[in-house]
Amino acid sequence: MAISIVLVAKICFELSYDRCYEDSERIFKIKTAYSQQGHASEFGQVSGAVALGFKQYVPGVKSATRMTFIVDSERFTDEQGNILSGKMIIADSSWFDVFPTRILAGDPKSALGTSARAMVARSFAERLGGVQEAVGQLIENEELPGYKITVGGVFEDFPHQSSQRYDILLSMESYPRSSTENWLGNDRYRAYVRLEDGIDYKMLDPAIRLMQEKNQPLDELEKAGTELRYYLAPLAGEHSAESNVRNMLIILGIVALLMLAISLLNYVLYAISAMVKRSKEVGVRKCYGAGTGSIYSMMMREAALDVLLSLVVAALLILALRSVLGELAGVPVGALFVPVSYAVLALVVALVFIVAALVPARLYSRIPIASAIRNYKENKRIWKLALLFVQIAVCTFLVCLVEVIALQYDKAINDKPGYEYEQLAYANLRGTDASTHAALVERLRSVPGVEDVQMSYDIPLHGSSGNNVYLPGSERELFNIADQYEGTPGLFDMLGIRFTDGRYPQNLEEVAVSTGFLTRMAEFADWSDGAVGKQICLTGHPECSDILTVCGVYEDYRIGTLTDSDSRASVKFYAEIGVGFMPFLLVKLERMDREVLGQLNTLLDEAFPGRGLGFTAYKDTMREFYSNERKIRNTVMCGCVVCLLIAIFGLMGYVRDESERRSKEVAVRKVNGATSREILGLFIWEMVRISLVAIVLADIGAYFVGGLCLSYFAEKISLSPWIFISADLVVLGVVCATVAVNSLRISRSNPVESLKTE
């Protein structure tokens, strides 16, 4: 019951995402739909002026706001040098018009309208000394050394089911207007609008198009083969519409339903087992005038008490295991219980009570009055076997599901993404003095156990921003690529990324492209004689030559993760240490040795004292990127173990009842020469026959649900029959072992004891 309650609450929590704001149904996200040379795609970000344009040009838009990220680091220091942790974004002065919350101190319009000022959340303000005390204090992010941010006000934290849960909102005035007020390019902003009451967002498309025509060169874009339009999407449904979230909710819902079902089945099974013992009680009650209503009332009182006790125990378990359950859920357990959770849980408890009361009551009400004066022989064996059949099927289904999820998770964290990372560690030097990087690299290379040291704009696991490709002499943009930006010359050699043609760039006029780049370019130009030496142009690279020469073609490697893979072609540029923007320092070790990492961290701390920088094993970061998959695996595994235990208890009760019912039959068999092994085989074979049918049906269901689990991975394990066979053997083994252990007493009993009453 405890795990089921948490799972139901988790589902309600996810479904209530971004429904926590006042009139949340009127909040929409501005999205971009664009097409390049017939290839259509969607994007969740826009240029800086677009949100302001919606407010100015689109009737029915009450307010509009935008935000963007400015730093990766969450490490801040206050005036006393204390280290604080917080997530910071840049937001404009209309932020709280779209996302209202209680303002505890300061004027948000003034704070978010003044450069270098910020609004902070209550939880962050309390770490600065208190809500009122925080106002006026200065904080500094480690990636922006010397840039002092003044706290201008404090707002109440947004709840955990909000996608806008940030600690620090830095004013948009702190950012260059060339970025915040442009209509094309630099589409780094997430933009949101709040509509007037009664406005149908689907009817705003003509006004949105008119806004674009007034402010964007749409005709020129179309001539270049690019189509661009904006549309509104309800914010409240965005989170649950994501494929990985949707699949997770389906899996958690199935597990919660099966756990509740198997618990109820076990309750009914025990109620049926008790019928023989309680038949005289029911018969006597009927003799004294108890009707069907009285029997139903009695069973409902008993069920109410049992459900109440189970809820109390469940609450105590949740309280005791709140840290473990919070880790599985990804948020504090208390945060899961949003208002809708209580309503849904009340409905679930009511359904549990109805089934737990009415099914046994129906069976007990049919006990004849004669049972009060003679032995009641009805044993409901078919009922018991049917309930056990379902329990075994549920357990098999969950064991199969655990195996599928565990194998896919293992594949993900031991992935072969097209580059070598097993002995790789990295550190993010963003915000440090780039002129010191070259000396640091040389010092790191001298450490015993270090094989190589290189620098890069980013690591492949973090994904990639994009830019557009066009040919010299033409303004027609051909396609969008994943721009991996700069890296030092030895980077690809260190990562084991192989060149199929040419080499790594050696100056700012050269660029290396992926094999996927050639595939896309083949749609627009004839490069059949080779890509090396061909010339292209790219947007977003003012530091490079206007015309770039392709110097090499490298094999495609995965950018992102298996669950969020960037399938675009990619490019890579050259830069010198200390000149190009390359904040990521990558070190390849001869073997992943914590002692060597400690030496590297010491050198890093000496180079940048007080920054708290350190190296992270690449493989550890990869594991963290798949933390949601790990949590799903662990959740299903917990449900599987609990269901197996419940099924074992039910099976034990059934074997005990059958041993009593068939004691004389067993005694006669033993008198006629049957051995203990044959008696055990008798009980085991009966359950094996039932189990085989249940297992086959469970395997079929697990195959389809397992396929659903794998659907959002770029690379999947194959659903081999051996996965299901191994799961089947586990369940059969548990069934046979349980039956064997609980049949030992009857198989070894003295037949005289069972026959002496005859």
Which stretches of residues belong to each language-model region?
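Small-residue-rich transmembrane alpha-helices
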Residues: 6-9, 213-214, 268, 303-366, ...
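Membrane-proximal extracellular/periplasmic loop immediately following the first transmembrane helix
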Residues: 7-74, 184-194, 205-207, 229-237, ...
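Generic structural signal for small/hydrophobic residues in well-ordered secondary structure
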Residues: 7, 14, 30, 54, ...
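Mid-to-C-terminal secondary-structure elements
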Residues: 92-105, 118-244, 442, 446-624
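Membrane-helix entry/capping segments
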Residues: 21, 207-258, 276-277, 291-292, ...
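Hydrophobic alpha-helical transmembrane segments of multi-pass inner-membrane transport and secretion
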Residues: 1-13, 245-280, 308, 383-406, ...
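N-terminal Sec/SRP start-transfer signal
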Residues: 1-3, 300, 365-393
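Intracellular coupling helices
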Residues: 263-306, 366-377, 649-690, 748-757
